Amino acid sequence: MLPLAFLICSGHNKGSMARAKAKDQTDGIYAAFDTLMSTAGVDSQIAALAASEADAGTLDAALTQSLQEAQGRWGLGLHHLRHEARLTDDGDIEILTDGRPSARVSEGFGALAQAYAPMQALDERGLSQWAALGEGYRAPGDLPLAQLKVLIEHARDFETDWSAGRGETFQRVWRKGDTLFVEVARPASAEAALSDAAWDVIASIKDRAFQRELMRRSEKDGMLGALLGARHAGAKANLAQLPEAHFTVQAFVQTLSGAAARNAEEYRAALKTAAAALEEYQGVTTRQLSEVLRHGLRES
């Protein structure tokens, strides 16, 4: 028979190992959430916040704030819904939409994308047909500037439909309470963003014969398909596990409050700021995706 002291020590060690494993899994969930937010250019610091031993309420508030910021950049057109994220008792992070669970981070990024897909209503341009507000006046997108100025300066809750902007962008504006929201969008799905990045990678290949071969393959399989086909057999599956395969920056929302929210000049400045931010974020995304396609799909 084993000594009692050994049994006690052994049980203690097993308990410590189980706690360490659970902590590692939870830390991995926090890091995965931060990585998901990075696809929207959101500097989420949930892993660091959790490491500082912040309480559950503080973590839930930070999770929700990051998710709502990401919703303004993913361009899914779900502004009319309430978005929250919270910790679960078993160490996961649950994503909620209008109070109902949509997916858990542990289920993978694709699961969240699939949950959001039926909620969307995109037109042929990739723009949301949903109103940003549940209620309120909706003006046409081609509203004359003089009338738009009146709405911005005097109207209560309102929104406009999409109108064409510069550089293949689209724009709309809405007011909710004391806040004016200015959105600029350039629809580019995650797949399209990856294809753009694949083009950059192929264009940078110095081996011209190999480059020509990939261009030939792209006629059948597309840029991304050609590049993945030239990698190892698991490259496509590895890519599908990354958040970049499902989410990308397609829009930017700039907000104004107080007196600025009723100033037409401030609105025009916000429009320029949003357009510039969108241009920057989409450019950064393409460069980051190019690096992923070059180096980040190694065999595991």
Curated annotation (Swiss-Prot):
Signal peptide: none annotated. Induction: Induced to high levels following extreme ionizing radiation exposure. Also highly induced in response to desiccation stress. The PprA protein combined with an immunofluorescence technique can be used to visualize radiation-induced DNA strand breaks in mammalian cultured cells, allowing the evaluation of DNA damage responses. This detection method could also be applicable to genotoxic tests in the environmental and pharmaceutical fields. Phosphorylated by RqkA in vitro. Phosphorylated primarily at Thr-88, and to a little extent at Ser-128 and Thr-160. One of its GO terms (molecular function) is damaged DNA binding. The modification Phosphothreonine is found at T88, T160. It comes from the Bacteria. The modification Phosphoserine is found at S128. Disruption phenotype: Cells lacking this gene show a reduced growth rate, do not exhibit a decrease in the efficiency of natural transformation, but are much more sensitive to ionizing radiation than the wild-type strain. Transmembrane segments: none annotated. Keywords: DNA damage, DNA repair, DNA-binding, Phosphoprotein, Stress response. Disulfide bonds: none annotated. Changing T88A: Strong decrease in phosphorylation. Lack of phosphorylation. Phosphorylation increases DNA binding affinity. GO terms for biological process: cellular response to desiccation; cellular response to gamma radiation; DNA repair; double-strand break repair via nonhomologous end joining. dsDNA-binding protein that contributes to the ionizing radiation resistance of D.radiodurans. Plays a role in DNA repair and genome reconstitution, and is necessary for recovery from severe genomic fragmentation as a result of exposure to severe levels of ionizing radiation. In vitro, binds to double-stranded DNA carrying strand breaks and stimulates the DNA end-joining reaction catalyzed by DNA ligases. Thus, PprA plays a critical role in a non-homologous end-joining (NHEJ) pathway for the repair of radiation-induced DNA double-strands breaks. This is DNA repair protein PprA. It comes from Deinococcus radiodurans (strain ATCC 13939 / DSM 20539 / JCM 16871 / CCUG 27074 / LMG 4051 / NBRC 15346 / NCIMB 9279 / VKM B-1422 / R1). The gene is pprA.
